[in-house]
Amino acid sequence: MNVSQDTIYAQASEHISDFQFDNRVAGVFSDMIRRSVPGYTQIINTIGDFADRFVMPNTQIYDLGCSLGAATLSIRRQIQGRQCRIIAVDNSESMVARCQENLNAYVSDTDVDLVCGDIRDIDIQNASLVVLNFTLQFLPPEDRETLIAKIYQGLNPGGILVLSEKIRFEDAPIQTLLEEQHLDFKRANGYSELEISQKRSALENVMKPDTLTTHQQRLTSQGFSHFSLWFQCFNFASMVAIK
């Protein structure tokens, strides 16, 4: 699959609109996320490994905020023959259209219901795995606990939630250090100072990261009895919570 290079913020603009997962972003998303999120490939691959361990036959898997389908495809490769169904949801028509193309390129005996809709409206039931891969951070903070509660209720006992997020830190020097390390990561991947600055402006009103403590407290308050941070690189993290 050809991957187009992300140059969305390469030209100076007087007015930076809020970031949207529109057709422009969908067309370069694979390149954008690889160059912006440290450890993204490892996270995607490990989601597949978690699926192999936790997905039970005749259950459902939910990929909430599926974007181009990377996590869904990783899961699909690991659960052949289990008579499961994946429900992959994204609210961007452009993302869903490209996700469908990616799903069509791979043969599998695991059906995928690809839904263009709001993840807050999805009914979750008989789930052995739910994935929120850099999705929760884009929801209004007041809606996050309700979604986690819905996920907990829809998971079967022993089911797992994989939650990946950009995180923030209450310790100001640590916040500054790891934010700077992330900016260096983006510079090393070819982004200019202009691109970094303009994308930051586009994201500041639409992406609101939480601290790890907030994530853990939210998960345990809704009933998850087992929680662990399994991956962190700079200010990006992935967690698991087991019912």
UniProtKB/Swiss-Prot annotation:
S-adenosyl-L-methionine binds at Y40, G65, C66, S67, D90, N91, D118, I119, N133, R200. Its EC number is 2.1.3.-. SUPFAM superfamilies: S-adenosyl-L-methionine-dependent methyltransferases. Keywords: S-adenosyl-L-methionine, Transferase. Homodimer. Belongs to the class I-like SAM-binding methyltransferase superfamily. Cx-SAM synthase family. This is Carboxy-S-adenosyl-L-methionine synthase. It comes from Shewanella baltica (strain OS155 / ATCC BAA-1091).
